[in-house]
Amino acid sequence: MNTSISSTNSGTYRGVRAAAGAAGRREPVGEAVEELCAAVFTSLRRRDQRERGRQYVRGLLAAQGRKSIRNIAQQLTAGAGAGGAAAAEQSLHHFIAASTWDWQPIRAALSQYLGGTAPLNAWVAQPMAIPKGGEHSVGAGHRFDPHRGQMFRGQQAFGTWFTSAGVVTPVGWRLHLREEQEAADESYEECAVTAVLDTLREARESGAATRPVVLDVRDIATRAALNRFAEARVPVVGRISPEARLLVTDPRLPGFGAGTLAARDVLQNVRGLRMPVEWPDPELPGARRTSLVAAVRVMVPDPAPGRRREVLLFGEWEAARRLPTQLWVTDMVRTEPGALVRMTKTAHRVSAAAGASVQDVGLRDFSGRSLPGWHRHVTLASVAHAARCLAPAAAPVAASVPVRHSPLHRPRAHAAVLAGR
C-alpha cells in the first residue's frame, strides 16, 4: 500500500500530538509556521505542494540532529512504521530534488512579509562555509575560505539577510560552484555580489524599499564590486582590504597628490581626526561599546575616467595606539561616520544569529548533487528560520500538530531608521 505523508495524518499525528503534550511543548513557533507558510507559499499552484512545503518547514524545526530528508520524514511519520517513513522520504525527496517549483517567488514573498513586521534597516551579505566530507554534494570540494582565512572541504554559499529592529533572518542564497560545474567562471567576489543583487532585485519587484547593503565579506569592496552596486543604484557599505589602493581627494589631507596609497596608510595618516563613536553591543543586549573612528573621502582608481567617483573610507580602532581593526568604504558619502559604524554592527547581529540558529533549521544539511534541490532546501530552511524569529517565544515545534490560526506577534517598528546617503 502506497502511504503518502498526508495519509498518515489521522493516526500518526495523534501520536505526535500526544508525545508533544507529554513533553510540555508549547506551539508559538508552530503558529508562526502556519501564518508564514500561508503568506509565502502562494506561488505554489497546487494545494499538495503548499501542504508539502508546510510539512517540510515543520519537519526542519522539529527534527533532532541533522535535518536530512530521511530524518524529516521519520519525524513527520513517527509511529507509522518503516513503510510509512520510506514513502514519506521518497515523496519529500521528489518535492525537493526533482520537482519543478520555483524557489525565487517564495524568497521574494518572504522578504515582503518580513518588511511588514518592521522597517528594514539594512541587508547584510555574509558567506557561509558548509563542511562536506564526501563527493556527493553539489559544489563540494577543497576550498579556501577568505572570510576565515583557512582551507576546508565542502561548499561555499553566500546568504543575504534581512535585518530590522527585532528580526535577523536570511532570505536569499547563492552557491559558489567549482570549476567543472555551472557558472564555473564566477569568482568568489562575483558570486557574493550576485547573491545580494539577485535578492534585492526580487525584493524590489515585490515592492520593498531600497535600503543599504552591508557587505560583510572580507576584502569584498573592490572596484568591480562597487561599480556593480552603483549600476544597480543600491547604496553599499563594504569591507575593504587594508592593502587596497586608494587616492586621497582632499587637498588639505596628508597623501593628497602622492598617488595611490594603501587604505590602512590613508587612515593612519588621519588618525588625529578620530572621534569616539558609541554603539550597542549586538551580542550583549543593553551593553554599549565605544570605538575610535576616522573617515576620509577617497577615490577608487579606475582606468575608465567616467566611472571614477568619490567614496568614503572609514576605519575603526579598538585600541588608540594600534592599527585600525575594521576598514570599510561606502558610496553614502554624506552619512555621518558614527551612523555608518553602527550600521556595520548589523553584521555582528547576523553572525550571532547564524551561530545560534543556522544548525537548528538545517541550512547546512542538504545532501545531493541537485543544485535546484539545494536551493529549495535552503529556501524552506530560511522560512523555518524566519518563523523562529517571528514567534513570540522560541520553543520546540512538533512536526505535525494542528495549530489554531492567530495573528503573529510582530516586533515593534524601529523608531529611528537611518536617514541620508
What are the residue ranges of the model-derived segments?
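A short, flexible helix-boundary coil/loop motif
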Residues: N2-L36, V40-Q49, L253-P301, Q359-S367, ...
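Short, positively charged, Gly/Tyr-enriched micro-motifs
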Residues: R25, C37-A108, V213, A387, ...
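Short, conserved catalytic/metal-binding motifs centered on acidic residues
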Residues: I72, L120-P131, T160, R211-D219, ...
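Electropositive, glycine- and tryptophan-enriched low-complexity nucleic-acid-binding patches
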Residues: S91, H147-T210, P324-Q326
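Active-site-proximal, Lys/Arg-enriched surface segment
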Residues: F95-V171, H176-E179
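An anionic, glycine-rich sequence signature occurring as long contiguous blocks
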Residues: W173, V237-S241, L246-T346
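Domain-level cores of phosphate- or acyl-group-handling catalytic modules
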Residues: D185-D250
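Short amphipathic alpha-helical "interface-anchor" segments enriched in bulky aromatics
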Residues: R334-G368
